[in-house]
Amino acid sequence: MSLASAETAKIVKEYQLGKDDTGSPEVQVAILTAKIIKLTDHMKAHKHDHHSRRGLLRMVSQRRKLLNFLKRNDLQRYLKLIERLGLRS
Protein backbone atom coordinates (compact mmCIF):
# COMPACT_ATOMS: atom_id res chain seq x y z
CA MET A 1 0.00 0.00 0.00
CA SER A 2 1.47 3.29 -0.99
CA LEU A 3 0.47 6.83 -0.27
CA ALA A 4 -0.74 9.21 -2.93
CA SER A 5 1.85 11.80 -3.88
CA ALA A 6 -0.40 14.54 -2.49
CA GLU A 7 -0.49 12.80 0.90
CA THR A 8 3.28 12.37 0.88
CA ALA A 9 3.81 16.02 -0.07
CA LYS A 10 1.53 17.13 2.77
CA ILE A 11 3.47 15.02 5.29
CA VAL A 12 6.82 16.29 3.98
CA LYS A 13 5.64 19.89 4.26
CA GLU A 14 4.42 19.33 7.81
CA TYR A 15 7.57 17.61 9.13
CA GLN A 16 10.40 19.11 7.08
CA LEU A 17 13.12 21.02 8.90
CA GLY A 18 14.07 23.28 6.01
CA LYS A 19 12.63 24.42 2.69
CA ASP A 20 14.07 21.56 0.62
CA ASP A 21 14.19 18.91 3.35
CA THR A 22 12.69 15.61 2.23
CA GLY A 23 15.07 13.10 3.78
CA SER A 24 15.48 14.02 7.42
CA PRO A 25 14.65 11.29 9.93
CA GLU A 26 11.53 13.23 10.99
CA VAL A 27 10.14 13.24 7.46
CA GLN A 28 11.03 9.59 6.86
CA VAL A 29 9.43 8.46 10.13
CA ALA A 30 6.28 10.51 9.46
CA ILE A 31 5.88 8.98 5.98
CA LEU A 32 6.49 5.47 7.30
CA THR A 33 3.96 6.05 10.08
CA ALA A 34 1.30 7.09 7.56
CA LYS A 35 2.05 3.99 5.45
CA ILE A 36 1.95 1.76 8.53
CA ILE A 37 -1.44 3.15 9.57
CA LYS A 38 -2.83 2.60 6.08
CA LEU A 39 -1.45 -0.93 5.85
CA THR A 40 -2.70 -1.78 9.35
CA ASP A 41 -6.23 -0.91 8.24
CA HIS A 42 -5.76 -3.12 5.18
CA MET A 43 -4.55 -5.99 7.36
CA LYS A 44 -7.65 -5.77 9.57
CA ALA A 45 -9.80 -6.48 6.51
CA HIS A 46 -7.45 -9.02 4.91
CA LYS A 47 -6.07 -11.15 7.72
CA HIS A 48 -4.49 -13.78 5.45
CA ASP A 49 -2.51 -11.35 3.29
CA HIS A 50 0.91 -12.56 4.38
CA HIS A 51 2.78 -10.67 1.69
CA SER A 52 1.45 -7.36 2.97
CA ARG A 53 2.13 -8.45 6.53
CA ARG A 54 5.78 -8.93 5.68
CA GLY A 55 5.88 -5.45 4.16
CA LEU A 56 4.23 -4.02 7.26
CA LEU A 57 6.80 -5.64 9.55
CA ARG A 58 9.60 -4.33 7.35
CA MET A 59 8.22 -0.79 7.57
CA VAL A 60 7.84 -1.00 11.34
CA SER A 61 11.43 -2.22 11.61
CA GLN A 62 12.72 0.58 9.39
CA ARG A 63 10.81 3.17 11.43
CA ARG A 64 12.25 1.74 14.65
CA LYS A 65 15.79 1.97 13.22
CA LEU A 66 15.26 5.61 12.22
CA LEU A 67 13.82 6.43 15.63
CA ASN A 68 16.78 4.77 17.36
CA PHE A 69 19.16 6.80 15.19
CA LEU A 70 17.36 10.01 16.08
CA LYS A 71 17.27 9.09 19.77
CA ARG A 72 21.04 8.46 19.80
CA ASN A 73 21.93 11.66 17.97
CA ASP A 74 19.36 14.24 19.12
CA LEU A 75 17.13 13.29 22.03
CA GLN A 76 15.07 16.50 21.94
CA ARG A 77 14.11 16.03 18.27
CA TYR A 78 13.25 12.39 19.04
CA LEU A 79 10.99 13.29 21.96
CA LYS A 80 9.28 16.04 19.96
CA LEU A 81 8.68 13.68 17.02
CA ILE A 82 7.18 10.80 19.00
CA GLU A 83 4.92 13.27 20.78
CA ARG A 84 3.72 14.76 17.46
CA LEU A 85 3.10 11.33 15.96
CA GLY A 86 1.60 9.84 19.12
CA LEU A 87 4.09 6.96 19.27
CA ARG A 88 5.36 5.12 22.32
CA SER A 89 9.04 5.43 23.06
Swiss-Prot record:
Q: Does the keyword DNA-binding apply?
A: no
Identify a single GO molecular function assigned to this protein. rRNA binding
> Which InterPro entries does this one have?
Ribosomal_uS15, Ribosomal_uS15_bac-type, uS15_NS1_RNA-bd_sf
Q: Which PROSITE patterns match?
A: RIBOSOMAL_S15 (PS00362)
Gene3D superfamilies per record:
6.10.250.3130, S15/NS1, RNA-binding
Cellular component GO terms, alphabetical: cytosolic small ribosomal subunit
Q: Biological process (GO) annotations?
A: translation
Q: Which UniProt keywords apply?
A: Ribonucleoprotein, Ribosomal protein, RNA-binding, rRNA-binding
Give the multimer and partner information. Part of the 30S ribosomal subunit. Forms a bridge to the 50S subunit in the 70S ribosome, contacting the 23S rRNA.
Role this protein plays: One of the primary rRNA binding proteins, it binds directly to 16S rRNA where it helps nucleate assembly of the platform of the 30S subunit by binding and bridging several RNA helices of the 16S rRNA. Forms an intersubunit bridge (bridge B4) with the 23S rRNA of the 50S subunit in the ribosome.
Q: Which family does it belong to?
A: Belongs to the universal ribosomal protein uS15 family.
Protein's recorded name: Small ribosomal subunit protein uS15
Gene name? Answer: rpsO
